[in-house]
UniProtKB/Swiss-Prot annotation:
Homotetramer; dimer of dimers. SUPFAM superfamilies: Aldolase (SSF51569). This is 4-hydroxy-tetrahydrodipicolinate synthase. The active site is at Y132, K160. GO terms for cellular component: cytosol. The gene is dapA. It comes from Kosmotoga olearia (strain ATCC BAA-1733 / DSM 21960 / TBF 19.5.1). Keywords: Amino-acid biosynthesis, Cytoplasm, Diaminopimelate biosynthesis, Lyase, Lysine biosynthesis, Schiff base.
Length: 294
């Protein structure tokens, strides 16, 4: 599994349909920019509001377009273990390289329940499983000790860590060095990716890289190579854009940003709505200041 920067990509819409022409151009833009991986149908890809048929079509389209150049990882999380297994099996049948599985939301399982959830999924699929911890969205936090229990299952290969808790990340890094050093830890927060990699993490699964892929790749590569001065310089330059992309619920701002770059409309599906006037102003200025939009 990759080290570096992977994009959690948008899903472009045209009216109420998937805009495959824009998706094709967008995936090419990502690949040409040197991105290290693509996460399709995650939070940023508006997975909750695509139909089962659309899911299959989107996965097949992305796998074919990428053609093995980078890993294609599909979001298959659910608060039903059986449903997540079904989605994960389908993703692998359609050619995915891995699945990204968010912790179950709303029903708030215990740490034992979380372990059994991931264990059941991992045992049901032939490929890589990545845990996704984002308690701000799910209402549940998978703690480092539980993550490391999961890491002892061979095909659970890493975690997208978006708790926002650096102490928790540090504890995870400390523990994994003893249990399974090759287990990957990616930041799920763009504004903390530099710090996570400097602490020994493996990269970022990024929203920022939807609009600044080459810069994100360069920043993470520099940090992984130990060129902290270069990585810090890029991080600080991009920091206002990182913040701008989250002034409203993701993916509202980034959908507007990719629209400005020419990758389809800014259409989102309800209950998400288009960016406010203030968000548009802030995002556009941040893009211009960072040099990603002229």
């Amino acid at each position: 599994m990759f080290r570096g920067a992977a994009s959690a990509v948008i899903t472009p819409f045209k009216g109420n349909e998937i805009d495959y022409d824009s998706f094709d151009k967008f995936l090419k833009f990502q690949l040409d920019s040197g991105i290290n991986g693509l996460i399709v149908l995650g939070t940023t890809g508006e997975a909750p509001t695509v139909t089962s048929e659309e899911r299959r079509e989107i996965i097949s389209f992305a796998v074919k377009k990428v053609g093995g150049r980078v890993p294609v990882i599909i979001g298959t999380g659910s608060n039903s273990t059986a449903h997540s297994i079904e989605l994960s099996q389908e993703a692998f049948e359609l050619g995915a390289d891995g699945v990204l599985v968010v912790t179950p939301y709303y029903n708030k399982p215990t740490q034992e329940g979380l372990y059994r959830h991931y264990e059941a999924i991992a045992k049901s699929v032939p490929g890589h499983v990545i845990i996704y911890n984002v308690p701000g969205r799910t209402g549940i936090d998978i703690i480092p000790e539980t993550v490391l229990r999961c890491a002892q299952i061979e095909n659970i290969v890493g975690i997208k860590e978006a708790s926002g808790n650096q102490a928790q990340v540090d504890e995870l890094l400390r523990l994994k060095a003893k249990v399974r050093p090759e287990f990957k830890i990616w930041s799920g927060n763009d504004d903390q990716a530099f710090h996570l990699v400097c602490s020994g993490g493996d990269g970022v699964i990024s929203v920022l890289s939807n609009v600044a892929p080459s810069q994100t790749v360069e920043m993470i590569a520099a940090a992984l190579e130990g060129d902290l001065e270069k990585a810090r310089e890029i991080h600080l330059k991009l920091f206002p854009l990182m913040k701008a992309l989250f002034i409203e619920t993701n993916p509202i701002p980034v959908k507007f940003a990719t629209h400005l770059l020419g990758f389809g409309s800014e259409t989102l599906r309800l209950p998400l709505t288009e960016a406010s006037k203030r968000t548009r102003e802030v995002v556009k200025k941040a893009m211009q200041d960072c040099g990603v939009l002229r």
